[in-house]
């Protein structure tokens, strides 16, 4: 039976002003058949696995912190293709086009053997085991113990042309009407920051600012107790309208709870008891113990596990293998704006810490009669080894109004680098130039000298890798280049005895129809 109802729903109208549509780079970028191979040197770093080591006065850093649980953020600087002396200058028209790089493949090489490290704290806040306790746990004034464990296992890398965006939880500013009393838990908020080289990754205790939110300095291991652990904000980067921060990523994490402990100290949030809501919660969560029993004083409910990364195997490695970029997750399909590339890496499967012992007494080691631990100093060092290889494709950007409008809205400095602005003719072609401009005999120099281009990531710490002179057209001379030629079905051609800059696919003969 059909019954008529009056319109009781809302009417949604389109916006009064049109919303600008962001085009994918595939819609206006013209790709050429010119490919380059780029590779870095062997990148090595050595340091202490837990903290920075300073001199006796504390004013000079002697050994930096190098941990397998840190992020490594490589900032690869590429040459400007518009200033290349190309073998074939007819590839593009500089009056109507500009050249950019596109990433087609990469391989992150890692040296050193697989290994598991142990991290911990000499004053770790844990009170016995809560999984298999045979007696009721009692607390004292200081129950901290010297405890160590292995971290969560993580392999991950993120590739983009801007730094990777990370997220972590930090202390928030309380509202003005809420008087923050001493000893109360502060409000927390989620913050987004760039992941820099050396930032700690999550090792099983969460992505949090431990320096600001753990005053006891004993709830986590030494390598993160004074740090902020960050985790990539994949949700934010996946919804980026331009897709520059993350073209694609690979991730593998695993852990399991190995030990179960309880924290020492006074519980901040009490379990609801009879005094709540006029006795409504009486005996709702627990029944008190009898007098004379150890259970009379209820224990602490701050339970936590120590995780373990479990087995480290070469069967599940993300590194030392090629990755090919056919389609990125965002609108930027691998175009390296500003001729730079950011690779954020975390890998703690090669997490061995070297133990180095040094005899600290005068005389030869062979003269030692018996072992004395006080005569030896123990040191720890961690080493890392990287090598990065890229396959770059030369692409053309047409200088059309619609394309330039989107690029200007995305990053106006790109147009300045391309020198597209109108340069007026100087009023006077002859300018005055003083030789001794800083002497007392000449006038004062200009107080407002022309400013150099400011780095948009000034103040951020990255591992800079200069690849401006590390490009080659001879792809078949390199391991990653040969893999790319094979998987893409390309073969290198020769013109006039020199290597050509183009590749063509293999031609197959047409099959003849069989006569019946």
Curated annotation (Swiss-Prot):
<dbReference type="InterPro" id="IPR011222">
    <property type="entry name" value="dsDNA_vir_gr_I_capsid"/>
</dbReference>
<dbReference type="InterPro" id="IPR036973">
    <property type="entry name" value="Capsid_L1_sf_Papillomavir"/>
</dbReference>
<comment type="similarity">
    <text>Belongs to the papillomaviridae L1 protein family.</text>
</comment>
<dbReference type="Pfam" id="PF00500">
    <property type="entry name" value="Late_protein_L1"/>
</dbReference>
<keyword id="KW-0946">Virion</keyword>
<dbReference type="GO" id="GO:0019062">
    <property type="term" value="P:virion attachment to host cell"/>
</dbReference>
<comment type="function">
    <text>Forms an icosahedral capsid with a T=7 symmetry and a 50 nm diameter. The capsid is composed of 72 pentamers linked to each other by disulfide bonds and associated with L2 proteins. Binds to heparan sulfate proteoglycans on cell surface of basal layer keratinocytes to provide initial virion attachment. This binding mediates a conformational change in the virus capsid that facilitates efficient infection. The virion enters the host cell via endocytosis. During virus trafficking, L1 protein dissociates from the viral DNA and the genomic DNA is released to the host nucleus.</text>
</comment>
<keyword id="KW-1162">Viral penetration into host cytoplasm</keyword>
<keyword id="KW-1164">Virus endocytosis by host</keyword>
<dbReference type="GO" id="GO:0005198">
    <property type="term" value="F:structural molecule activity"/>
</dbReference>
<keyword id="KW-1048">Host nucleus</keyword>
<protein>
    <recommendedName>
        <fullName>Major capsid protein L1</fullName>
    </recommendedName>
</protein>
<dbReference type="GO" id="GO:0039620">
    <property type="term" value="C:T=7 icosahedral viral capsid"/>
</dbReference>
<keyword id="KW-1015">Disulfide bond</keyword>
<comment type="subunit">
    <text>Self-assembles into homopentamers. The capsid has an icosahedral symmetry and consists of 72 capsomers, with each capsomer being a pentamer of L1. Interacts with the minor capsid protein L2; this interaction is necessary for viral genome encapsidation. Interacts with protein E2; this interaction enhances E2-dependent replication and transcription activation.</text>
</comment>
<dbReference type="GO" id="GO:0075509">
    <property type="term" value="P:endocytosis involved in viral entry into host cell"/>
</dbReference>
<dbReference type="InterPro" id="IPR002210">
    <property type="entry name" value="Capsid_L1_Papillomavir"/>
</dbReference>
<keyword id="KW-0945">Host-virus interaction</keyword>
<keyword id="KW-0426">Late protein</keyword>
<keyword id="KW-1160">Virus entry into host cell</keyword>
<keyword id="KW-1145">T=7 icosahedral capsid protein</keyword>
<keyword id="KW-0167">Capsid protein</keyword>
<dbReference type="GO" id="GO:0042025">
    <property type="term" value="C:host cell nucleus"/>
</dbReference>
<keyword id="KW-1161">Viral attachment to host cell</keyword>
């Amino acid at each position: 039976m059909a019954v008529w109802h009056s319109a009781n729903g809302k009417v949604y109208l389109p916006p009064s002003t049109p919303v600008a549509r962001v085009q994918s780079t595939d819609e206006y970028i013209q790709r050429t058949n010119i490919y380059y191979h780029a590779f870095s040197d062997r990148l090595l770093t050595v340091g202490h696995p837990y903290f920075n080591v300073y001199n006796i006065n504390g004013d000079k850093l002697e050994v930096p912190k190098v941990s397998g649980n840190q992020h490594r953020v490589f900032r690869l600087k590429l040459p400007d293709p518009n200033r290349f002396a190309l073998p074939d200058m007819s590839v593009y028209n500089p009056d109507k086009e500009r050249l950019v790089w596109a990433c087609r493949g990469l391989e992150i090489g890692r040296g050193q053997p697989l290994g598991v490290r142990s991290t911990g704290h000499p004053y770790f806040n844990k009170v016995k085991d809560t999984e298999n306790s045979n007696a009721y746990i009692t607390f004292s004034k200081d129950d901290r113990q010297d405890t160590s464990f292995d971290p969560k296992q993580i392999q991950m890398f993120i590739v983009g042309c801007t730094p990777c965006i990370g997220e972590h939880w930090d202390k928030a500013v309380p509202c003005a009407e809420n008087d923050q009393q001493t000893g109360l838990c502060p409000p927390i908020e989620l913050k987004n920051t760039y992941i820099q080289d050396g930032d700690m990754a999550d090792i099983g205790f969460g992505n949090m600012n431990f320096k600001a939110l753990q005053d006891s300095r004993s709830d986590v291991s030494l390598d993160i107790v004074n740090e902020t652990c960050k985790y990539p904000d994949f949700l934010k980067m996946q919804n980026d309208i331009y897709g520059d921060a993350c073209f694609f990523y690979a991730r593998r994490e695993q852990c399991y709870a190995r030990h179960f402990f309880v924290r020492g100290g006074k519980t901040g949030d009490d379990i609801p008891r009879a005094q709540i809501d006029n006795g409504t919660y009486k005996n709702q969560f627990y029944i008190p113990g009898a007098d004379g029993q150890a259970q009379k004083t209820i224990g602490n409910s701050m339970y936590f596990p120590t995780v373990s990364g479990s087995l480290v195997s070469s069967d599940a490695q993300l590194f030392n293998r090629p990755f090919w970029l056919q389609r990125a997750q965002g609108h930027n399909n691998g175009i390296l704006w500003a001729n730079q590339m950011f690779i954020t890496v975390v890998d703690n499967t090669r997490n061995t810490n070297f133990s180095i012992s040094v005899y600290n007494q005068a005389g030869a080691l062979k003269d030692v009669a018996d072992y004395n631990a006080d005569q030896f100093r123990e040191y720890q060092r961690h080493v890392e080894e990287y090598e990065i290889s890229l396959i770059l494709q030369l692409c053309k950007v047409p200088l059309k109004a619609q394309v330039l409008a989107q690029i200007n809205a995305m990053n106006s400095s790109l147009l300045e680098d391309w020198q597209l602005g109108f340069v007026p003719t100087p009023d006077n072609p002859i300018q005055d130039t003083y030789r001794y401009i800083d002497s007392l005999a000449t006038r004062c120099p200009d107080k407002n000298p022309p400013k150099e281009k400011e780095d948009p990531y000034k103040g951020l710490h990255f591992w800079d890798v200069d690849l401006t002179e590390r490009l080659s057209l001879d792809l078949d001379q390199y391991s990653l280049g040969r893999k790319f030629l094979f998987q893409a079905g390309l073969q290198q051609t020769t013109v006039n005895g020199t290597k050509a800059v183009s590749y063509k696919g293999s031609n197959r003969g047409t099959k003849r129809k069989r006569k019946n």
